[in-house]
Structure formats: C-alpha cells, structure tokens
Amino acid sequence: MMNHLLLKTQTQTEQVMNVTNPNSIYIKGRLYFKGYKKIELHCFVDTGASLCIASKFVIPEEHWVNAERPIMVKIADGSSITISKVCKDIDLIIVGVIFKIPTVYQQESGIDFIIGNNFCQLYEPFIQFTDRVIFTKNKSYPVHIAKLTRAVRVGTEGFLESMKKRSKTQQPEPVNISTNKIENPLEEIAILSEGRRLSEEKLFITQQRMQKTEELLEKVCSENPLDPNKTKQWMKASIKLSDPSKAIKVKPMKYSPMDREEFDKQIKELLDLKVIKPSKSPHMAPAFLVNNEAENGRGNKRMVVNYKAMNKATVGDAYNLPNKDELLTLIRGKKIFSSFDCKSGFWQVLLDQESRPLTAFTCPQGHYEWNVVPFGLKQAPSIFQRHMDEAFRVFRKFCCVYVDDIVVFSNNEEDHLLHVAMILQKCNQHGIILSKKKAQLFKKKINFLGLEIDEGTHKPQGHILEHINKFPDTLEDKKQLQRFLGILTYASDYIPNLAQMRQPLQAKLKENVPWKWTKEDTLYMQKVKKNLQGFPPLHHPLPEEKLIIETDASDDYWGGMLKAIKINEGTNTELICRYRSGSFKAAERNYHSNDKETLAVINTIKKFSIYLTPVHFLIRTDNTHFKSFVNLNYKGDSKLGRNIRWQAWLSHYSFDVEHIKGTDNHFADFLSREFNKVNS
C-alpha cells in the first residue's frame, strides 16, 4: 500500500493548485447509507493493495463489525499493522453504476477509500488509460471512469455527523491529498505538459496494457486442448444413431511399414492427451494418414478417420454456421484486428459415454474410440459453433466467430485493448484453450475466412491462387475436375466472368457424359490458369457509402458487380466491391433479351442482398426496357405473371435506375464469349 503525505488544508493554501501524480489513479465514488446524505469520495485505485480499505470517518459506525479473523498488513515503511474492523457487502456507486464490494477493511491511510486489487480482479479486465480507467461489470459491460487530476479527503472528525439528514452541523473543510504542487496557476498547463511527458507516458501505459494482454493470452493458451490446469470441460456433445440396433462397420485398410511407424507415434500422443482410449465398440471405421499440401505445412502426416458410413447412419445437427458475407459486413470499416484460433477446437468438446463407441476406429495398433468430438464427424462444426456462439454472443459488436476462428475488431487501439481483454477473459472463464502460435494481436491486416483483409480491402489468401496454378493441365477424372471447379467457386467474388469460364469444364461433369480429356481440354485449362494470375483487392463498402450495382446479360450468361462511391476530399471514386456471374437455366435461355436483363438485375440483388438491405442504391444498366419495366402497371394478365412476380419482388428494395449507353457499359466486356471456345 502506498504511503501518502497529507498536505495543508484548502483554506491555508488559497494560492496553491494541487495536482495528482500522473501515475496515481483517483476516481469519484459515492456511498449511500440510510439516514445519511450521499457521501461523495475521491477513491484511490491501488493495484498494489490486496484489500479495499476505508476510513472510519466515511462509513457510519453501525456498519462496521469485528472481523472474524483479524488480518495483519505490511505497510510501506516495512512495519505491520493489524486490521480488525470490516464492512460487508457495501455498494460503491461509480458514474451511476453500482459495484458491490464483499468486504472493506477499516484503516486510516490518509485517503478516504482505497480500491484494492481484489476489486480490480472482481471487475476485470481492469484497464488504465492516460485520462480514464475501465472496470468491467458482469464480465461484459465496460464502465469508463474519468481520472481526477485533483483529489481531496473529506473523512475527518465530524464529517459523518454533518452528513446526517436534517443535520445542521457544518461539513469540515476537505483536506487536499494531491501530491504535486503548482505555486503559479498560470503555469499549470506548461508544468502538467512537462511533468506528465505525455508521449512517454502514453508509450509506457501502452506497454503496460500490452503486457497485461500478453498475460491474459498466456492464461488461456496451451498445446494441450484438454490442459487440466486450464480447461473447465463445459463443452459437451451427444451423437445418436438413426437406427440404434445397427452396427456400422467398414473393413480395415492395409498399411505400409512407414505408416505403421507413424501410427505408433500418433496413437501414443493421442493416448497421452487422453482424447482417445482403447475400445470394445461394435462399430468400426478405418483410420488413415493424409499427406496433402495443407498437412505438409505442419511438417508431418496427420491421422484422419473415414466416418462416411457413420455420418450416413447418425442424426445430424442442423445448427447453422454463420454466413460468411454477414461476418464480413460486421468488420467493415474497422481499423485494428486481433485473431485467435482454438487449439484443436473439436477436441475441447467432451462426448458423453453413450456417444463414444460410435467414434470407434481401427488402425495398426488396434481398436480405439474418442473421448472428445473427432474431426470428420458431420455434426462437429455445428456442435462447436453452438458452444462458441453461446460464449461470445454478448460481444457481437466487436467479435465474430467462425467455428474455431475468433476475430476481434475495433475502431481504435484503446477500444481494442479493452475488447481483446474481454474476449480473453471470457476464454479464461469458460476454459476455452487457444493456440499461442496462431494468435495475431493488434494487426491492421489479418487472414480470416480464407481472405486477406487489409485497410478496407479484401482478397483471397495467396494459397488459393497457388492451388489453382498447381493443378495439372491434364485432369484424370471427374473428381479431380470437381476439386478444381470448387476452388474457382470459392473465389467467385473476385472473378467477373466465372460462369462462362467454367461452363466448358462444367459440361464434362454431366452424368450422361462419359469422362474424356482431350488435347483441347488441356489447352483450355492452360488458358483458364493464365487468366487467373492474381486476384484484385476489392473494396469493403462502408455503411455510409452509396452503393451501385451494374448488370449485363448475354444469351446464356448474366453478370453483376457491386460498387461503392467513396468520397475523398470532395472527389467521388467508384470502387469495385464484388463480382458475381451465372448461367441461365434452360427455360430462361428462351426468354426475351429484356427479360434476361431484368433477371440479371434480380440475380445480382439476391447475391448482394446483405449489403443492399435496407439501403437506397443505384441500379445501372444499358437495357432501356428495365427503367420503364419498374414503373409499368401490370393488371394481372396471366401471360405476364412472371413480370408481375418480378415487380413485386423488386418492390421490397429501394433504388434508382440509371441507363447508360452500351458503349459505356464496361462491365459488359466481362461477359465476352472469350471462354466459350478454345480457339475464339
């Protein structure tokens, strides 16, 4: 506890201004007692004090009781004192918020009320800024409290008597307890500026806060997803068979000597972690080792289990994963990010005893089953997402979670320090274990949802392009082609002409078309890959920016583009935010060209609805019919039923229509037939 010197009373120092030490934390607090007026105090926040301490002159005598166990406290001069009086369950009101303190001890320290470290821990995360501090109520509600630059002590002889209701006793003069004196008030600003060394102080406090963040992170990180010192084992799951009488068996696989050696190592590790155990289950699924590019990055093979048969036989979990576009809208406009990855997330979810036999697998070492949710079960992502949503839903204004990925986003560093602290505190509270090596703190650029998010732009991570370029020009079968087209679809927002680009390849996947890969197909693959040498960073539209969609249609395809108008120093700049394209269905190919243009608008709005609801936007098209179509009054002619439905659907949106000349519709260039034929 700090040792404070009392200064002269205010009446004796009329020409002296007193300022608190810049490293001291004084805040306003208020106490209420029956029969007394409100008692306003300048409280000292002392993280070095283990207890909350108050003067006997600020809490009425009838509220003090003898402590069950008197405590001995060592003070600054090295001597010890015994504290025997305590006040229990006191309410301290700070900026209108009630903070309940279980115990306050009585001791004369020269300060009315000392808020000790037990209070800071009870309402953590506690964060200090240059001009304020933050306590957190109920683990989720941050309370911002301004620091005092001048502090006084009111608790002297006669103070409580003067605070009784209807008392006519004059209140004693407050005693100034500020520790820095300024003899000339005119010099206050200059001396404060010099004394605080604001830039250095800010750096020092930032370092302190970063250190606190690192300490919080360390508390919740481990290489063991079931670390007994950190897990609370609160995540539980149950899996059930559709037909409980049926045993699900898949015959074992054959293994090479090298695979057997690798299994020896991995099974031992899993047993040591206590995530698996020997099994007598009637069910059986084969385990095998994967050695693809993603696993090479880990430096070794990884054991996986083929649960295809079990997944067909068990009841699914319909809990939805978050929509990725919705998550991206949450973080738009934010300036600073931190991201965290749950350590082997699914393994932090314990299976009940009845479910464990369903996870049984075979390998060279024998028959085992999981104590936790294993990777490969169809229910695993939904089970984990439900638990994570339950834990972090209260923080949705600055945190989003996609399965085992957690992202924290803020407008500035000060807010971010608080936000990160609250998330880490919640992880600590629930025993959610994070990976230290995958944590990214206080970044302007992060990877999330397979995207690089940087300064208001986004694009696919580099490995997406690497996968595309590493695909062979000659494909072996339909499965390999499906994987290639799947990667293209993943990056569809960044490829303006994807529908027509993939159509010749998509046609080879039809059920009635036998597999055949020709020289022309190889040339076409080379052409596709050549045209995908990089993805442009696209703009992430801010809520206040006006949005535009531009559309166009050809005989077989439609395309759309989302743009935003960014105003910078009075200049309007149109920035591309997303691309989408598609092919018309067989029946739609017979529509009139005007209807195809209308359908292109509708399809584009559907794709970008997350951004276009509920805002007023602009539709830009080179089709002269669409503007009049919106205003036409159809009277129920059955031949025009499609148009009536389209009008009704469009009426749910607020937009203007701008017609542009075909020569000015640069987006139409993206719908060229360049990819329809190899030799075009």
UniProtKB/Swiss-Prot annotation:
Top-rank taxon: Viruses
Hydrolase recorded as keyword: yes
EC number from the UniProt entry: 3.4.23.-, 2.7.7.49
InterPro entries hit by this protein: DNA/RNA_pol_sf (IPR043502), Pept_A3A (IPR000588), Peptidase_aspartic_dom_sf (IPR021109), Rev_trsase/Diguanyl_cyclase (IPR043128), RT_dom (IPR000477), RT_RNaseH (IPR041373), Viral_Replic_Matur_Polypro (IPR051320)
GO biological process, alphabetically ordered: proteolysis
Region (Protease), start-end ranges: 41-131
Active site: 46
MF (Gene Ontology): aspartic-type endopeptidase activity; endonuclease activity; RNA-directed DNA polymerase activity
Catalytic activity: DNA(n) + a 2'-deoxyribonucleoside 5'-triphosphate = DNA(n+1) + diphosphate
Gene3D superfamilies attached to this UniProt entry: 3.30.70.270, Acid Proteases (2.40.70.10), HIV Type 1 Reverse Transcriptase, subunit A, domain 1 (3.10.10.10)
Keyword terms of this UniProt record: Aspartyl protease, Endonuclease, Hydrolase, Nuclease, Nucleotidyltransferase, Protease, RNA-directed DNA polymerase, Transferase
UniProt domain Reverse transcriptase: residue ranges: 273-453
Function, as annotated: Encodes for at least two polypeptides: protease (PR) and reverse transcriptase (RT). The protease processes the polyprotein in cis. Reverse transcriptase is multifunctional enzyme that converts the viral RNA genome into dsDNA in viral cytoplasmic capsids. This enzyme displays a DNA polymerase activity that can copy either DNA or RNA templates, and a ribonuclease H (RNase H) activity that cleaves the RNA strand of RNA-DNA heteroduplexes in a partially processive 3'- to 5'-endonucleasic mode.
PANTHER family, per the entry: POL PROTEIN, RIBONUCLEASE H
Domain text: The polymerase/reverse transcriptase (RT) and ribonuclease H (RH) domains are structured in five subdomains: finger, palm, thumb, connection and RNase H. Within the palm subdomain, the 'primer grip' region is thought to be involved in the positioning of the primer terminus for accommodating the incoming nucleotide. The RH domain stabilizes the association of RT with primer-template.
Similarity remark: Belongs to the caulimoviridae enzymatic polyprotein family.
Name used for this protein in its record: Enzymatic polyprotein
Organism field: Cauliflower mosaic virus (strain NY8153)
